[in-house]
Structure formats: C-alpha cells, structure tokens
C-alpha cells in the first residue's frame, strides 16, 4: 500500500499505510526477545496466528521475524526516497531484530525456523523460510552502509544455496504446510542473493540468483491449462505466469509476483531470452487477478482479489449457492493484493498502466 501510494501520489493512502506501519513498530515488540510478535487478537500481541495449530514448536518463526524486519526496512527506504521522510526509528528497530536473529544462527550459519518467545534462542532449524532473516540482514547493510556482517552473510548464503537451492528442494517456507517442498521460502533467498550482489558485485551471487529463480520458475505452468469451471473458465483467466504454492497445496497464488524486481535485476545484469519470457509472463499474470469491476470473479468489489486460483480440480472447495464448484476462493485477501502491488509498483512501474 505504501509503495502504491508513493507511486500514485495518494496522500490519504500514504497516511493510512504509515499509520499502520508506525503502530506495529511502536507496539509489536516482544520485550523478552526483542523480536516482533506475529499476530494480534483480543488477548493482545502474540505468536499464535491462524497457522499455529499446524506447528510442532511454539514461538517466533524465523520466516515472519525476518520478513517483518525486511519490510520495515523496505518501507523506511521507500518513504525516504519517494516520500521525503526518514524513519530512523524503524531502521533502528529492524536492526535490533536482525542482531537478535544473527545471534541465534546455528553452526552452519542457518537462521532458526522457530525461536523461543521467552529468550529468543533458536529452538528448531532446517528450513528455507528462515532465509528471510538473511534478506533482512542484507537490506540493513545496504541501507545503513554497515558492511561488518558481510562475511557472516556470505557464510549463511552459501549454506542456504548448498542445502536447499542447489538440491532443488526448498522446504520450510509457509508455516501451514509442515515443511513441504514449496515456492515461498526461495523468494526470500532470491531477495538476499540480489542484495548481496548489489553489496559486493561478486558474480557468484548473480549465478545463485539465476539458479534460485530457475527453481522458482519450475512452479510456473508453461501453458495455459484449459479451465471449464467458473469463474476462471468464464473470464479467460490465464494460469501461465503465476506460481503453484507448494507440493501439498494445488493452487496458484500471487506471492511470486513480489520478486518481479529481482527477475528484472537478473535480466538487466545477465540478459537471457528465457528469463525475459518468464518476466513477461509474471508481469502479465499479475495484472489479471483482481476484480476490474464489482463481482467480475463472482464476488466482491472492484479491486478485490483472492489468494486461490485453481488451475485444476485439485482444490475446488469453494461452492456457489447451488452447490456447484468454483475455481477461486470467494474471499478478500489483503496479502494477495499487496503481493501484486509490490511487484507492479516496483522497478517496473509504468505510470501509464
């Protein structure tokens, strides 16, 4: 929302985004660990989100701890560059979170999958999703100019590459899949590899970025699957360009649109026809998944979108009132819309639409 507001010059939207981010930064910190809580409810801030019942160990997750620090830094950077307002308190908070996460790495340089909500100590490891911590550390180094952690970041990057990316087996991303092999955790690594290339100029990171994107592209269909079930089959929705979520969840969702900038970065530094085609696919797919008018997808208002797009009959759990299946989920998913906005308002931004 903040990126979109800054691109559009929408002051009301920007104020709403800054208010939300500022509230989280001011109130969501766990004083016992120095990390940000992951959810909020009637009982206050906590780490028991909707995914909690599927977890084996309670506590903070490296996935969300690193992701929250990364996006806090990204928001500060964007609002300073395009909005003219610095947020040193956000940068300092994210830096303190990164420091706590760095202290919890294991001997391989891997960040925790789960951290204690009492002490911040690492309790469980073995996950690609914790690469969000590495992405946050790299972005903090870029924004502050503090390069003192580069050697440790290089060690962590090498571990994630060898243990997950090089094997083509990235698991432990989303918290609701019991560490199934998925397409989400690698999105954090993709960001980290791009940032480390920016920081060092080392060709190694560009090669690793290419390999990580090649893995992510395996979750994209190279053809448009024939769809008969509405609403997707009725409106001409294209399955080509989006990414399947994981090996245990057969639908396409929009999270891969968040790395449009990274795909474009690779193409700018190592031009390749295949990468250019996947960039074009992802960009086109990202522009067709929301209601362009009320109830275009048989529910909701203009601008609404879901997270679930069923390219097959594997997850058509949504039903119409007459009991017939629907090929999407009739739900407003803010994170899904935000994923598209992050990609479409980034480096590829075209004010002409």
Which ranges hold each PLM region?
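Glycan-recognition and catalytic cores of secretory/periplasmic carbohydrate-active enzymes
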Residues: 1-353
């Amino acid at each position: 929302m903040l990126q979109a507001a800054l691109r559009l010059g929408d002051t009301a939207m920007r104020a709403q985004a800054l208010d939300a981010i500022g509230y989280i930064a001011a109130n969501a910190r766990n004083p016992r660990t120095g990390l940000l809580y992951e959810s909020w409810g009637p009982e206050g801030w906590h780490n028991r989100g909707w995914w909690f019942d599927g977890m084996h160990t309670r506590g903070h997750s490296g996935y969300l701890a690193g992701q929250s620090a990364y996006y806090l830094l990204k928001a500060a950077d964007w609002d300073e560059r395009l909005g003219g307002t610095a947020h040193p308190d956000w940068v300092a908070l994210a830096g303190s979170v990164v420091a706590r996460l760095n202290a919890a790495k294991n001997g391989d340089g891997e960040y925790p999958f789960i951290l204690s909500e009492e002490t911040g100590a690492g309790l469980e490891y073995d996950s690609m999703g914790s690469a969000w911590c590495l992405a946050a550390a790299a972005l903090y180094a870029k924004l502050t100019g503090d390069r003192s952690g580069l050697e440790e970041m290089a060690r962590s990057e090498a571990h994630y590459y060898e243990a997950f990316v090089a094997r083509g087996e990235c698991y432990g991303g989303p918290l609701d899949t019991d560490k199934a092999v998925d397409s989400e955790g690698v999105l954090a690594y993709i960001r980290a590899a791009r940032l480390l290339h920016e920081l060092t100029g080392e060709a190694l990171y560009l090669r690793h970025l290419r390999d990580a994107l090649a893995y992510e592209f395996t979750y994209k269909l190279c053809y448009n699957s024939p769809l008969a079930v509405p609403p997707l089959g009725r409106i001409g929705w294209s399955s080509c360009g989006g990414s399947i979520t994981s090996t245990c969840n057969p639908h396409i969702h929009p999270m891969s649109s968040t790395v449009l900038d990274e795909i474009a970065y690779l193409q700018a530094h190592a031009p390749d026809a295949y990468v250019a085609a996947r960039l074009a696919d992802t960009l086109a797919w990202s522009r067709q998944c929301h209601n362009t008018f009320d109830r275009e997808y048989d529910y909701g208002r203009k601008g609404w979108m879901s997270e679930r797009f069923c390219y097959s009959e594997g997850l058509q759990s949504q039903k119409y009132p007459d009991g017939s299946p629907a090929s999407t989920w009739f739900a407003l998913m803010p994170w899904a819309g935000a994923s598209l906005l992050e990609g479409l308002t980034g480096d590829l931004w075209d004010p002409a639409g």
